[in-house]
Amino acid sequence: MSRVLVMGGSSGIGLETVKALLGRGHDVIAFSRGAKNLRLDHPKLDRISGDATNTEEVRNAITDADAVVQALGVPVSLKLLTGPIDLFSSATKTLIPIMEEMDIKRLIAVTGFGAGNSNEAINCVQRIPFNVIFGHAYRDKSAQETLIKGSTLNWTIVRPGVLTNQSLKRSYKVRLKPSEWRNGIISRAAVADYIAAAIDDDTTIGEEPVLTT
């Protein structure tokens, strides 16, 4: 089993991924600003509080890891609409050189449907509201994807659709081909289930699936 660092591991997809990885027997490091307040106890769980854009804090957290899950998020706020947002690209600029230096190859990064080349699959009805609400964040997520693809890491980019807090149903769809890409709902638990299964699955390296129900 791997020892996995989950960045953004105290909430949202990150927290669900921590739970899913623990359920599969992995050792997990939950890394986030609020990690010390994480209300989850498990003998294979370590918590490290830190800033994903701080080089020394990331280096300290990643030291014993075999793989990294990047599941960062920004809160819904006025800044999401007005921007600018650079968390995703800044954290990735911090992370990649450290992983390459320490020869930690496996990275799974969560972005979203509409980031990178999946933006072309947004239909005309959704495009205007998507750009108004999520434009700043997703431009930065697209920059994040570009950085990851330009690295030497064994990466998988995960692009969930509209997120819900519903319980896990393993009937979700993993849309690998651009011709299959479309928006749809997906639970955070389902995204985490995919990540936990993919972490040691070399067949997912270089893939960028869109996940929906």
Label each residue range with its predicted role:
Residues V4-R24:
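N-terminal Rossmann NAD(P)H-binding glycine-rich loop of SDR-like oxidoreductase domains
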Residues H26-R33:
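Conserved glycine-rich Rossmann-like NAD(P)H-binding loop of the short-chain dehydrogenase/reductase
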Residues I29, S90, T94-H136, G150:
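Conserved Rossmann-fold NAD(P)-dependent oxidoreductase catalytic core, especially the SDR/UDP-sugar
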Residues K36-S90, T94, I98-E101, I199-T203:
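NAD(P)H-binding glycine-rich loop region in Rossmannoid oxidoreductase-like domains
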Residues S77, F113-N119, L163-Q166:
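Conserved catalytic-site region of short-chain dehydrogenase/reductase
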Residues E145-S167:
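Conserved beta-loop-beta element that borders a ligand/cofactor-binding pocket
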Residues V158, I186-A196, E207:
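Substrate-positioning beta->alpha
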Residues S167-Y172, A198-E207:
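Glycine/proline-rich active-site loop of Rossmann-fold NAD(P)-dependent oxidoreductases
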